[in-house]
UniProtKB/Swiss-Prot annotation:
Lineage: Bacteria, Pseudomonadati, Pseudomonadota, Gammaproteobacteria, Enterobacterales
Protein name listed in UniProt: UPF0246 protein ESA_03332
GO CC list: cytosol
Family that this chain belongs to: Belongs to the UPF0246 family.
Organism from which the protein derives: Cronobacter sakazakii (strain ATCC BAA-894)
GO biological process, one term: response to hydroperoxide
InterPro entries assigned to the protein according to its UniProt record, in alphabetical order: YaaA (IPR005583)
PANTHER family to which the protein is assigned, alphabetical: PEROXIDE STRESS RESISTANCE PROTEIN YAAA, PEROXIDE STRESS RESPONSE PROTEIN YAAA
Length: 257
């Protein structure tokens, strides 16, 4: 079972590390190509491209310029410990055991606009480059055209290595769009998380993102390998709703808190 999640805009390079083990990203040559393009942008162009403030644009211009591919624990951090958004609040990788990191390294992948695909222990230097960014490269008008089938090929390698053909898509639509489902050698399971508000169940972004992290952690902690095992997920009050689920879409609900 291979879990896919999105990265986060919020990064943490200060907290104590939960592990000293690390690996190197597998698509650094591609990342270098994107860095070369991004370095040619002015602060103002970055601000417009990413719809961010001039202060954030300046920070990201500095990150692009400081980026250099000789990643060490001194200038980079393991991806699963560097990302700090809502998904990662649910995941809580900082409390993983060594065995959890082992399982996650084989069964969890983070999709990334800059790095393509990251394993949990892959070192990464700080960046901001969301998959939906319309950064033109020699390969096309945006990052989807840049990555083409590369991400899918890398995921297929991971699927083959772990020996089963199930992908649990816990990534956002923006990121999963970089994957070619028809060329993925796997059955794709898509969990959906609905929270009750005023008597109606609906997707509430903050809760849904955190739930993706909670389910990722649940799979890792329980060493799940089969899709049917996912229906037992019950973290923080969620429960499987068979009546609302259909095909490969698994619906989980939670009553108003």
């Amino acid at each position: 079972m291979l879990i896919l999640i999105s990265p986060a805009k919020t990064l943490d390079y200060q907290s104590p590390l939960a592990t000293t083990r690390f690996t190197q990203p597998e698509l650094l040559d591609h990342a270098q190509q994107l860095i070369d393009v991004a370095r040619r942008l002015t602060d103002e162009e970055i601000a417009n491209l990413m719809s961010i403030s001039s202060k954030l644009a300046s920070l990201n211009a500095t990150r692009f310029n400081d980026w250099q591919p000789d990643f060490t624990p001194d200038n980079a951090r393991q991806a699963i410990l560097a990302f700090k958004g809502d998904v990662y609040t649910g995941l809580q990788a900082e409390t993983f055991s060594d065995a959890d990191f082992d399982f996650a390294q084989q069964h969890l992948r983070m999709l990334s606009g800059l790095y393509g695909v990251l394993r949990p222990l892959d070192l990464m230097q700080p960046y901001r480059l969301e998959m939906g960014t319309r950064l033109a490269t020699p390969k096309g008008k945006d990052l989807y055209s840049f990555w083409g089938e590369t991400i899918t090929q890398k995921l297929n390698e991971a699927i083959a290595a772990q020996g089963d053909n199930v992908v649990v898509n816990l990534a956002s639509d923006e990121y999963f769009k970089a994957v070619k489902p028809a060329k993925l050698n796997a059955e794709i399971i898509k969990p959906v998380f609905l929270d009750e508000k005023n008597g109606k169940f609906k997707v509430i972004s903050f809760y849904a993102k955190k739930a993706r992290g909670l389910m990722s952690r649940y799979i890792i902690e329980h060493r799940l390998t089969k899709p049917e095992q996912l229906t037992a997920f019950d973290s923080e009050g969620y429960f499987f709703d068979e009546a609302s689920s259909a095909g490969n879409e698994l619906v989980f609900k939670r009553h108003e808190q």
